[in-house]
Amino acid sequence: HNGFGISSIGGASNINMRASQYAAGHKASLVGGNRNYLARVMYTGSTGLMQNGWAFTGSASYRWANEGVIEGTFYNSAAYFLAAEKKFNDSHSLSIATWGSPTERAQQAAATEEAYWLAGSHYYNPNWGYQQGKKRNARVVNSYEPSLVITWDYNINDKMKLITSFFGKYSMYSTSALGWNGNAADPRPHYYQNLPSAAYDVWDLNYTPTDDELADYNTRLEYWKSSKANRQLNWDYMYFANQQANAAGGECLYYVERRHNDQLTFNLGSTLNIDFNRYNKGTVGLQLGTTRGMHYKTMDDLLGANKYTDIDKFSVGDFGINSDYVQNDVDNPNRQIAQGDIFGYNYDINVNKATLFYQHLFTKDIFNIFWNAHVEG
Protein backbone atom coordinates (compact mmCIF):
# COMPACT_ATOMS: atom_id res chain seq x y z
CA HIS A 1 0.00 0.00 0.00
CA ASN A 2 1.34 3.40 -1.04
CA GLY A 3 -0.28 6.58 0.21
CA PHE A 4 0.76 8.60 -2.84
CA GLY A 5 -0.38 6.46 -5.75
CA ILE A 6 -0.66 2.99 -7.23
CA SER A 7 2.67 1.16 -7.30
CA SER A 8 4.03 -0.75 -10.26
CA ILE A 9 5.21 -4.37 -10.17
CA GLY A 10 8.60 -3.31 -8.85
CA GLY A 11 7.12 -1.16 -6.09
CA ALA A 12 7.41 2.59 -5.66
CA SER A 13 9.96 5.06 -4.32
CA ASN A 14 8.79 8.21 -2.58
CA ILE A 15 11.36 10.83 -1.55
CA ASN A 16 10.41 13.37 1.12
CA MET A 17 11.81 16.74 0.04
CA ARG A 18 10.11 18.89 2.67
CA ALA A 19 12.78 21.06 4.28
CA SER A 20 11.29 20.63 7.76
CA GLN A 21 11.94 16.89 7.62
CA TYR A 22 15.73 17.31 7.44
CA ALA A 23 17.58 17.43 10.76
CA ALA A 24 19.23 20.75 11.58
CA GLY A 25 22.99 20.74 11.08
CA HIS A 26 25.81 20.62 8.56
CA LYS A 27 27.59 17.77 6.85
CA ALA A 28 30.58 17.66 4.52
CA SER A 29 32.08 14.59 2.85
CA LEU A 30 34.91 13.64 0.52
CA VAL A 31 34.77 10.32 -1.33
CA GLY A 32 37.38 8.67 -3.51
CA GLY A 33 36.72 6.07 -6.20
CA ASN A 34 38.34 4.23 -9.08
CA ARG A 35 35.44 3.65 -11.47
CA ASN A 36 33.38 6.35 -13.21
CA TYR A 37 34.81 9.20 -11.16
CA LEU A 38 37.92 9.78 -9.09
CA ALA A 39 36.52 11.91 -6.26
CA ARG A 40 33.36 13.53 -4.95
CA VAL A 41 33.04 16.47 -2.58
CA MET A 42 29.67 17.21 -0.96
CA TYR A 43 28.14 19.65 1.53
CA THR A 44 24.65 19.65 3.07
CA GLY A 45 23.15 22.15 5.50
CA SER A 46 19.69 22.35 7.09
CA THR A 47 18.03 24.72 9.55
CA GLY A 48 15.29 22.37 10.68
CA LEU A 49 11.87 23.85 11.45
CA MET A 50 12.48 27.25 13.05
CA GLN A 51 10.20 29.09 15.48
CA ASN A 52 8.92 31.39 12.72
CA GLY A 53 7.58 28.37 10.82
CA TRP A 54 10.27 28.39 8.13
CA ALA A 55 12.69 25.61 7.25
CA PHE A 56 15.52 25.61 4.72
CA THR A 57 17.89 22.96 3.46
CA GLY A 58 20.48 22.82 0.71
CA SER A 59 23.08 20.48 -0.71
CA ALA A 60 25.80 20.77 -3.33
CA SER A 61 28.28 18.26 -4.69
CA TYR A 62 30.85 17.82 -7.44
CA ARG A 63 32.20 14.61 -8.98
CA TRP A 64 35.04 14.41 -11.44
CA ALA A 65 37.66 12.24 -13.12
CA ASN A 66 40.18 13.24 -15.77
CA GLU A 67 40.05 9.62 -16.89
CA GLY A 68 37.98 6.75 -15.52
CA VAL A 69 38.89 3.09 -15.32
CA ILE A 70 38.14 2.87 -19.07
CA GLU A 71 40.76 4.68 -21.13
CA GLY A 72 39.56 7.76 -22.97
CA THR A 73 36.63 8.42 -20.63
CA PHE A 74 36.21 11.40 -18.33
CA TYR A 75 33.54 12.49 -15.86
CA ASN A 76 32.53 15.99 -14.82
CA SER A 77 29.34 16.45 -12.80
CA ALA A 78 27.91 19.00 -10.38
CA ALA A 79 24.69 18.63 -8.39
CA TYR A 80 22.51 20.82 -6.21
CA PHE A 81 19.37 20.58 -4.08
CA LEU A 82 17.55 23.53 -2.50
CA ALA A 83 14.35 23.37 -0.46
CA ALA A 84 12.24 25.76 1.60
CA GLU A 85 9.07 25.19 3.60
CA LYS A 86 6.65 27.44 5.45
CA LYS A 87 4.36 25.96 8.09
CA PHE A 88 1.49 28.42 8.50
CA ASN A 89 -0.35 26.50 11.22
CA ASP A 90 -1.22 22.94 12.22
CA SER A 91 -3.38 22.57 9.11
CA HIS A 92 -1.43 24.18 6.28
CA SER A 93 2.15 24.13 5.03
CA LEU A 94 3.73 24.98 1.67
CA SER A 95 7.06 23.63 0.45
CA ILE A 96 9.19 24.15 -2.64
CA ALA A 97 12.23 22.19 -3.80
CA THR A 98 14.49 22.38 -6.83
CA TRP A 99 17.40 20.20 -7.90
CA GLY A 100 19.57 19.31 -10.86
CA SER A 101 22.86 17.76 -11.90
CA PRO A 102 24.63 19.21 -14.98
CA THR A 103 26.91 16.44 -16.22
CA GLU A 104 29.44 15.87 -18.98
CA ARG A 105 30.86 12.38 -19.43
CA ALA A 106 32.67 10.40 -22.10
CA GLN A 107 31.45 6.95 -23.11
CA GLN A 108 32.88 3.54 -23.88
CA ALA A 109 31.83 1.60 -26.98
CA ALA A 110 31.29 -2.12 -27.33
CA ALA A 111 33.62 -4.05 -29.61
CA THR A 112 34.03 -7.60 -30.91
CA GLU A 113 36.12 -10.26 -29.22
CA GLU A 114 38.59 -9.94 -32.09
CA ALA A 115 39.15 -6.26 -31.29
CA TYR A 116 39.62 -7.04 -27.59
CA TRP A 117 42.13 -9.75 -28.48
CA LEU A 118 44.07 -7.41 -30.76
CA ALA A 119 44.10 -4.67 -28.13
CA GLY A 120 45.06 -7.12 -25.40
CA SER A 121 42.30 -5.97 -23.04
CA HIS A 122 38.55 -6.12 -22.57
CA TYR A 123 38.79 -2.51 -21.39
CA TYR A 124 39.57 -1.47 -24.97
CA ASN A 125 37.56 1.60 -25.93
CA PRO A 126 37.39 2.52 -29.65
CA ASN A 127 35.56 5.81 -28.97
CA TRP A 128 38.69 7.88 -28.47
CA GLY A 129 41.78 8.80 -30.44
CA TYR A 130 44.69 11.21 -30.44
CA GLN A 131 44.23 14.74 -31.79
CA GLN A 132 47.56 16.54 -31.94
CA GLY A 133 48.84 14.21 -29.23
CA LYS A 134 45.87 14.61 -26.87
CA LYS A 135 43.07 12.13 -26.23
CA ARG A 136 39.64 13.05 -27.62
CA ASN A 137 36.45 11.00 -27.21
CA ALA A 138 33.82 11.04 -29.99
CA ARG A 139 30.92 10.00 -27.74
CA VAL A 140 30.34 12.61 -25.04
CA VAL A 141 27.07 12.88 -23.13
CA ASN A 142 25.77 16.23 -21.87
CA SER A 143 22.80 16.02 -19.52
CA TYR A 144 20.95 18.39 -17.22
CA GLU A 145 17.45 18.04 -15.76
CA PRO A 146 16.51 21.11 -13.68
CA SER A 147 13.44 20.12 -11.67
CA LEU A 148 10.96 21.90 -9.40
CA VAL A 149 8.23 20.62 -7.09
CA ILE A 150 5.76 22.68 -5.05
CA THR A 151 3.68 20.88 -2.42
CA TRP A 152 0.71 22.01 -0.34
CA ASP A 153 -0.09 19.90 2.72
CA TYR A 154 -3.58 20.35 4.17
CA ASN A 155 -4.52 18.49 7.34
CA ILE A 156 -8.31 18.71 7.08
CA ASN A 157 -8.88 16.93 10.39
CA ASP A 158 -7.60 13.95 12.35
CA LYS A 159 -9.04 11.57 9.76
CA MET A 160 -8.26 13.24 6.43
CA LYS A 161 -5.16 14.76 4.84
CA LEU A 162 -4.91 16.33 1.38
CA ILE A 163 -1.55 16.55 -0.42
CA THR A 164 -1.33 18.49 -3.69
CA SER A 165 1.89 18.83 -5.71
CA PHE A 166 2.97 20.53 -8.92
CA PHE A 167 6.07 19.19 -10.65
CA GLY A 168 8.02 20.60 -13.59
CA LYS A 169 11.16 19.34 -15.30
CA TYR A 170 13.16 20.33 -18.36
CA SER A 171 15.35 17.41 -19.35
CA MET A 172 18.24 18.23 -21.69
CA TYR A 173 20.09 15.11 -22.84
CA SER A 174 22.43 14.81 -25.80
CA THR A 175 25.25 12.61 -26.98
CA SER A 176 27.83 13.32 -29.65
CA ALA A 177 28.71 10.86 -32.41
CA LEU A 178 30.94 10.70 -35.45
CA GLY A 179 29.33 11.22 -38.83
CA TRP A 180 30.64 10.82 -42.37
CA ASN A 181 29.21 10.97 -45.86
CA GLY A 182 28.99 8.29 -48.52
CA ASN A 183 32.34 9.25 -50.07
CA ALA A 184 34.34 8.72 -46.87
CA ALA A 185 35.65 5.52 -45.34
CA ASP A 186 34.24 4.42 -41.99
CA PRO A 187 36.62 6.00 -39.44
CA ARG A 188 35.85 3.60 -36.59
CA PRO A 189 38.87 1.38 -35.92
CA HIS A 190 36.71 -1.55 -34.77
CA TYR A 191 34.51 -1.46 -37.90
CA TYR A 192 34.53 -5.00 -39.26
CA GLN A 193 36.08 -3.97 -42.60
CA ASN A 194 39.04 -2.47 -40.70
CA LEU A 195 39.81 -5.67 -38.78
CA PRO A 196 42.24 -8.40 -39.90
CA SER A 197 39.36 -10.88 -40.24
CA ALA A 198 38.05 -8.82 -43.17
CA ALA A 199 40.93 -10.11 -45.31
CA TYR A 200 39.25 -13.53 -45.68
CA ASP A 201 36.89 -15.86 -43.84
CA VAL A 202 39.15 -16.68 -40.90
CA TRP A 203 36.30 -18.46 -39.11
CA ASP A 204 36.09 -21.20 -41.77
CA LEU A 205 38.75 -23.67 -40.64
CA ASN A 206 38.45 -25.57 -43.91
CA TYR A 207 39.26 -22.52 -46.04
CA THR A 208 42.81 -22.03 -47.31
CA PRO A 209 43.60 -18.35 -47.94
CA THR A 210 45.46 -17.22 -51.01
CA ASP A 211 48.89 -15.63 -50.69
CA ASP A 212 47.38 -12.19 -51.27
CA GLU A 213 44.70 -12.76 -48.64
CA LEU A 214 47.23 -13.99 -46.12
CA ALA A 215 49.49 -11.02 -46.81
CA ASP A 216 46.54 -8.67 -46.36
CA TYR A 217 45.67 -10.35 -43.06
CA ASN A 218 49.22 -10.06 -41.73
CA THR A 219 49.44 -6.41 -42.80
CA ARG A 220 46.22 -5.60 -40.96
CA LEU A 221 47.34 -7.60 -37.92
CA GLU A 222 50.70 -5.83 -37.77
CA TYR A 223 49.00 -2.44 -38.14
CA TRP A 224 46.64 -3.12 -35.23
CA LYS A 225 49.34 -4.44 -32.90
CA SER A 226 52.21 -2.10 -33.76
CA SER A 227 50.80 1.03 -32.09
CA LYS A 228 47.98 1.96 -29.73
CA ALA A 229 47.19 4.95 -31.96
CA ASN A 230 46.47 2.59 -34.87
CA ARG A 231 43.55 0.97 -33.03
CA GLN A 232 42.00 4.28 -32.00
CA LEU A 233 40.24 7.06 -33.90
CA ASN A 234 42.51 9.09 -36.17
CA TRP A 235 41.32 12.65 -35.60
CA ASP A 236 44.27 14.20 -37.41
CA TYR A 237 43.43 12.23 -40.56
CA MET A 238 39.78 13.35 -40.45
CA TYR A 239 40.86 16.99 -40.22
CA PHE A 240 43.30 16.44 -43.09
CA ALA A 241 40.62 14.80 -45.26
CA ASN A 242 38.26 17.73 -44.70
CA GLN A 243 41.01 20.22 -45.56
CA GLN A 244 41.61 18.37 -48.81
CA ALA A 245 37.87 18.52 -49.53
CA ASN A 246 37.90 22.26 -48.81
CA ALA A 247 40.70 22.79 -51.31
CA ALA A 248 38.68 20.96 -53.96
CA GLY A 249 35.47 22.86 -53.12
CA GLY A 250 33.85 19.66 -51.91
CA GLU A 251 31.57 18.60 -49.07
CA CYS A 252 32.55 17.85 -45.51
CA LEU A 253 33.71 14.23 -45.25
CA TYR A 254 33.83 13.81 -41.47
CA TYR A 255 32.02 15.65 -38.69
CA VAL A 256 30.73 15.27 -35.13
CA GLU A 257 26.97 15.49 -34.64
CA ARG A 258 25.02 15.82 -31.40
CA ARG A 259 21.81 13.84 -30.94
CA HIS A 260 19.32 15.51 -28.61
CA ASN A 261 16.49 13.90 -26.64
CA ASP A 262 14.95 16.71 -24.59
CA GLN A 263 11.75 16.64 -22.55
CA LEU A 264 9.56 19.30 -20.99
CA THR A 265 7.32 17.74 -18.34
CA PHE A 266 4.57 19.12 -16.10
CA ASN A 267 2.58 17.09 -13.58
CA LEU A 268 -0.17 18.00 -11.13
CA GLY A 269 -1.19 15.45 -8.53
CA SER A 270 -3.52 15.46 -5.55
CA THR A 271 -4.19 12.66 -3.06
CA LEU A 272 -6.67 12.49 -0.20
CA ASN A 273 -5.81 10.03 2.57
CA ILE A 274 -8.73 8.94 4.74
CA ASP A 275 -8.76 6.94 7.97
CA PHE A 276 -12.27 5.49 8.06
CA ASN A 277 -11.68 3.65 11.31
CA ARG A 278 -8.95 1.69 13.06
CA TYR A 279 -9.16 -1.07 10.45
CA ASN A 280 -9.80 0.73 7.16
CA LYS A 281 -7.76 3.31 5.28
CA GLY A 282 -8.36 4.70 1.81
CA THR A 283 -6.59 6.92 -0.70
CA VAL A 284 -8.22 8.68 -3.62
CA GLY A 285 -6.06 10.57 -6.10
CA LEU A 286 -5.97 12.49 -9.35
CA GLN A 287 -2.86 12.87 -11.50
CA LEU A 288 -2.54 15.04 -14.61
CA GLY A 289 0.57 15.13 -16.75
CA THR A 290 1.87 16.46 -20.04
CA THR A 291 5.22 15.82 -21.70
CA ARG A 292 6.74 17.27 -24.83
CA GLY A 293 9.62 15.22 -26.22
CA MET A 294 11.97 17.09 -28.56
CA HIS A 295 14.21 14.95 -30.77
CA TYR A 296 16.73 16.53 -33.14
CA LYS A 297 20.37 16.68 -34.21
CA THR A 298 22.79 19.60 -34.18
CA MET A 299 26.18 20.04 -35.80
CA ASP A 300 28.72 19.80 -32.99
CA ASP A 301 31.98 20.10 -34.94
CA LEU A 302 32.69 20.29 -38.67
CA LEU A 303 36.29 19.18 -38.04
CA GLY A 304 37.74 21.99 -40.12
CA ALA A 305 35.35 21.61 -43.08
CA ASN A 306 33.80 24.63 -44.81
CA LYS A 307 30.69 23.09 -46.33
CA TYR A 308 27.98 20.69 -45.22
CA THR A 309 24.67 20.36 -47.08
CA ASP A 310 21.66 18.99 -45.20
CA ILE A 311 20.96 15.98 -47.39
CA ASP A 312 21.05 12.23 -46.79
CA LYS A 313 24.44 11.47 -48.30
CA PHE A 314 23.80 7.71 -48.39
CA SER A 315 20.60 8.12 -50.44
CA VAL A 316 22.33 10.04 -53.21
CA GLY A 317 23.63 6.83 -54.78
CA ASP A 318 20.09 5.42 -54.97
CA PHE A 319 18.08 8.47 -56.03
CA GLY A 320 20.56 11.02 -57.39
CA ILE A 321 21.67 14.37 -56.01
CA ASN A 322 18.70 16.25 -57.51
CA SER A 323 15.98 14.01 -56.05
CA ASP A 324 13.66 15.25 -53.30
CA TYR A 325 14.18 11.90 -51.58
CA VAL A 326 17.69 12.89 -50.48
CA GLN A 327 16.52 16.10 -48.78
CA ASN A 328 16.34 15.99 -44.98
CA ASP A 329 14.20 19.15 -45.03
CA VAL A 330 12.10 19.52 -48.20
CA ASP A 331 10.99 23.00 -47.06
CA ASN A 332 14.61 24.15 -47.10
CA PRO A 333 16.38 22.09 -49.78
CA ASN A 334 20.18 22.00 -49.86
CA ARG A 335 20.43 24.10 -46.70
CA GLN A 336 24.01 24.83 -45.65
CA ILE A 337 24.77 23.77 -42.08
CA ALA A 338 27.09 25.58 -39.67
CA GLN A 339 28.19 24.58 -36.20
CA GLY A 340 25.23 24.54 -33.80
CA ASP A 341 22.58 24.30 -36.55
CA ILE A 342 19.77 21.73 -36.42
CA PHE A 343 19.92 19.21 -39.28
CA GLY A 344 19.05 15.62 -40.21
CA TYR A 345 15.80 15.29 -38.24
CA ASN A 346 13.73 17.47 -35.94
CA TYR A 347 10.41 16.29 -34.48
CA ASP A 348 8.35 16.43 -31.28
CA ILE A 349 6.33 13.78 -29.45
CA ASN A 350 3.54 15.01 -27.17
CA VAL A 351 2.03 12.85 -24.43
CA ASN A 352 -0.90 13.90 -22.23
CA LYS A 353 -2.12 11.63 -19.45
CA ALA A 354 -4.76 11.72 -16.71
CA THR A 355 -5.24 9.13 -13.96
CA LEU A 356 -7.93 8.77 -11.31
CA PHE A 357 -7.43 6.07 -8.68
CA TYR A 358 -8.67 4.70 -5.39
CA GLN A 359 -6.98 2.21 -3.10
CA HIS A 360 -8.16 0.62 0.13
CA LEU A 361 -6.33 -1.10 2.96
CA PHE A 362 -7.95 -3.29 5.60
CA THR A 363 -5.77 -4.35 8.54
CA LYS A 364 -6.83 -6.50 11.47
CA ASP A 365 -4.73 -8.81 13.59
CA ILE A 366 -2.59 -10.86 11.20
CA PHE A 367 -4.63 -10.00 8.11
CA ASN A 368 -3.93 -7.34 5.47
CA ILE A 369 -6.33 -6.95 2.58
CA PHE A 370 -5.49 -4.42 -0.11
CA TRP A 371 -7.27 -3.52 -3.34
CA ASN A 372 -7.16 -0.66 -5.80
CA ALA A 373 -8.77 0.55 -8.98
CA HIS A 374 -7.83 3.22 -11.46
CA VAL A 375 -8.86 4.69 -14.78
CA GLU A 376 -6.50 6.57 -17.04
CA GLY A 377 -6.29 7.97 -20.48
Regions inferred by a protein language model and the residue ranges of each:
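A beta-strand signature from Gram-negative outer-membrane beta-barrel systems
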Residues: H1-S29
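Transmembrane beta-strands of outer-membrane beta-barrel pores
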Residues: L30-N36, Y62-N66, G100-E104, G168-M172, ...
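Outer-membrane beta-barrel transmembrane strands
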Residues: Q132-A177, E251-Q287, G293-H295, Q339-F370, ...
